[in-house]
Amino acid sequence: MELYLDTANVAEVERLARIFPIAGVTTNPSIVAASKESIWDVLPRLQNAIGEEGTLFAQTMSRDAKGMVEEAKRLNNAIPGIVVKIPVTAEGLAAIKLLKKEGIVTLGTAVYSASQGLLAALAGAKYVAPYVNRVDAQGGDGIRMVLELQTLLEHHAPDSMVLAASFKTPRQALDCLLAGCQAITLPLDVAQQMLNTPAVESAIEKFEQDWKNAFGNLNL
């Protein structure tokens, strides 16, 4: 599987990359805007943080296919091998088809239904990103949608993969993996929740106390 961090915070990527076996970093316009850095400044820094083998994702801003393709080429020139995120609209699907012919790897983003995700995959997107928590927030069932999308891709677009996004809890991420997702991207707060387990700290403290009581120190 592929595990990504959903952030443009370079310092946090460097910190968590030492801990998590991350495959790379995903960004979107809101995430980049929150960083207060120009996208052309922050992307090289993120790539440096994840190393040459890490995969970086960045999104286009244009609403029409021509503009999306032009921006995708610009992103690819700046960071060779970058995966370009394209919103799965009618124009986005047209752009994904064109970029497939150009050899630029894409991710279909802002996916709220299994049918929408399937169309992105059939158009040529390597990755499809369903918004799990946002679907839940609208009264839907994000995990069920992911399961349906995963099944559709396995049957009809096996060269594409689900990269599930938009999580509020580690449980949502785990449920996506149980549904068969090959890739997920975690916001920093959810990644941190996975690390912060009070019961683990309590167990370690008990081990230390028992050892110290027996041997007078904490050395092996």
Swiss-Prot record:
Annotated compartments: Cytoplasm
GO MF terms held by the record: fructose 6-phosphate aldolase activity
Keyword Lyase in record: yes
Recorded GO CC terms: cytoplasm
Active site: 85
Enzyme Commission designation: 4.1.2.-
Alphabetically ordered keywords of this record: Carbohydrate metabolism, Cytoplasm, Lyase, Schiff base
InterPro entries (UniProt xref): Aldolase_TIM, F6P_aldolase, TAL/FSA, Transaldolase_3B/F6P_aldolase, Transaldolase_AS, TSA/FSA_arc/bac
Main location: cytoplasm
Biological process terms in GO annotation: fructose metabolic process
Entry keyword Cytoplasm: yes
Catalysed transformations (reactions): beta-D-fructose 6-phosphate = dihydroxyacetone + D-glyceraldehyde 3-phosphate
Record-linked SUPFAM superfamilies: Aldolase
Subunit structure: Homodecamer.
Free-text function comment from the UniProt entry: Catalyzes the reversible formation of fructose 6-phosphate from dihydroxyacetone and D-glyceraldehyde 3-phosphate via an aldolization reaction.
PANTHER family: FRUCTOSE-6-PHOSPHATE ALDOLASE 1-RELATED, TRANSALDOLASE
Record-stated family: Belongs to the transaldolase family. Type 3A subfamily.
Name of protein: Fructose-6-phosphate aldolase
Organism, scientific name: Salmonella typhi
